Amino acid sequence: MATVPKPARGGTAVEALVGQPTVLNPLFETNDSTRDVNSLIYQGLTSVDAQQNVVGVLATDWTVSPDHLTYTFNIRDGVKWADGQPFGADDVLFTFHILQDLEYQQPGADVWRQVGVSAGGSGQVVFTLRAPEASFPLTLRVGIIPKHIYTGMAPAQIASSPFSGVRAFGTGPFKVGSINQLAITLDRNPNAVPQPYLDHLVLRTYPATDPQLAIRAVLTGAADLVGGIQPQEVDTLLGRNGLTVLEARMFTNSFVSFNSDGDGKSFFGDPKVRLALVQAVDRQKIVSEVLAGRADADPNPIPTAGWAYSASAASLHPYDAIAAAKNLEAAGWLADPATKIRAKKGTSFKVMMVAADSYPNQQIAEALARQLLAIGIQVDVKLLPASKLLQDYLLTRKYQMALISIDVGADPDQYWLWHSGTEGGAVNFAYARGWGIIDKDLEDGRAAVDPPSRLAVYIDFQMVMADLAPAIFLYSGHYVYAVSQRVHGVHVNKAIEPSDRFQYVTDWYVNTSG
């Protein structure tokens, strides 16, 4: 009888990583590729399982006070850092105190400064909130750093330390072995639990400006894995001998925001007009033609991958170009017989939409403009570098329409994105008027602790958003990961954030026995 090969320790796998990682410290992540590497080195108190439940990693469990303001986390015993030193509650306290340090100027610092962090009983850390926030345990996915290495250092010194680079280590499955201009070599952490089968994982870096180079590396055998493959590239990988293509949903949302308070008020102040534009867009056609079908047409603010996604809300206002035209006419926007462009009181319906100048944003913006032109709305597309779009338009709200693609995370809490009371200096799309019911749903969703109550609130949130139409919600994307059959045991959850592709990296193997 044939013997089934069993996974054996040893060997090396190579991933073609798109983008250049920077500071290998989870407190100073600046891009996706850095987050990818850090997820292999560091661990947080919590993570998300395949069913989207928040589960403990460096915490075994936690309790919540009756007023939902105090979370007491029990820190896991017996964990060691990669250098052999014991991990404990002091490391957790140290990490979060750095996040609260006034010299720490990374995004989100102000949020952490509003959270009380203190020692509890033996092996416990206590977090105290100013207001209930049901999604709080998920925010504790941030990687914990070793106090015995960084104690006495200011945040800037921590970021520039060799332990945030060529000597980086944590409690995760790997630690940095070496770094050069072409690759980061990670070595197995001898103290990790569970132990990876792989001795080494090499992350060979390729420029974000030319991701095809990373794909070519897998096709030529220079690398074993490549992720984040754009939809138009997938067909070059499907059917290739020796390659498996994995696909998972992501917690991203792509939508067009209407600026109803500022530059777009004269066009989008009327909710009937906004709703007409929502009805005028054929999402499925965009997904099919621009994204090769590798996304979910999604009319909701909560992605289709999310546990609180409402199919009922998604079906409230389906694509109907005829109804859209009638609603525009009812709102006083009449088509000019000669130009076919709609006008009202002498003002033509001509607006500007800003979008990032990269794939697929440019192609989606142009497809949207064509669809809206078909019902008499002229949309001029202005393409910009992503950084300029953020700084000069989204943060300042100096736009009429804006195409946005954003990772909203696994939890349905979108307070930061849609609540009208959010402080300035952050991306937010709430309106100044008529927003009370949305605010209440977002507040109630944070305050509710049990999943059924939260689900009911977020279903209502999606229903109201569908009727108010503050945006044209378009699609939620898929993550595509190509894996050489030389590497076994690679699997991902049905819905992930990009760095979650490494969640089960300890199952990967290239060597077998038996």
Walk through the language-model features, giving the residues of each.
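N-terminal lobe/hinge region of extracytoplasmic solute-binding protein
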Residues: 16-66, 97, 169-170
